[in-house]
Amino acid sequence: MPESVRHFRWSDIPEERVTDAISRKLITGDQMMLAHVYLKKDALVPQHSHHNEQLTYILEGALHFFIGANREREVIVRAGEVLHLPSNVPHEARALEDTLDVDIFSPPRQDWLDGTDNYFHKK
């Protein structure tokens, strides 16, 4: 394969513990990021926004999303469904059951790469 082409196996990617209830595995390209995010039932991803466009595809389980700065919209995304979040849209999510979600970001989430994603630890 040319040097710029890379092949990955999820089983070879280290799992990063984000909180007691959330962990993730990341694969990053030049212009996008692919993440497996594992959430235990009732895990909370606190409200945040980012300049990255996001696609969330639920492989197993379900997430209850609250969209907007004042939580104006609610969406439940279940296994086999996809949610598109444009850039800079405030959102939070709670796992309705143990969940595996696949997130795609463009460009890659620099805060996830350098550990500055402090919104996970807001009280």
Map each language-model feature to its residues.
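Histidine-centered metal-chelating micro-motifs
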Residues: 44-46, 64, 82-83, 87-92
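Short, charged beta-strand/loop "edge" motif centered at a coil->beta-strand transition
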Residues: 32-36, 43-46
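A cytosolic small-molecule/anion-sensing beta-strand core signal
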Residues: 59-60, 78-79, 97
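Ligand-binding loop in jelly-roll beta-barrel domains
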Residues: 87-111
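A short, N-terminal "cap"/entry segment at the start of jelly-roll beta-barrel domains
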Residues: 1-31, 35, 118-123
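Short, conserved beta-strand element in jelly-roll/cupin
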Residues: 38-40, 50-65
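Short acidic-glycine-tyrosine-enriched beta hairpin
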Residues: 71-87
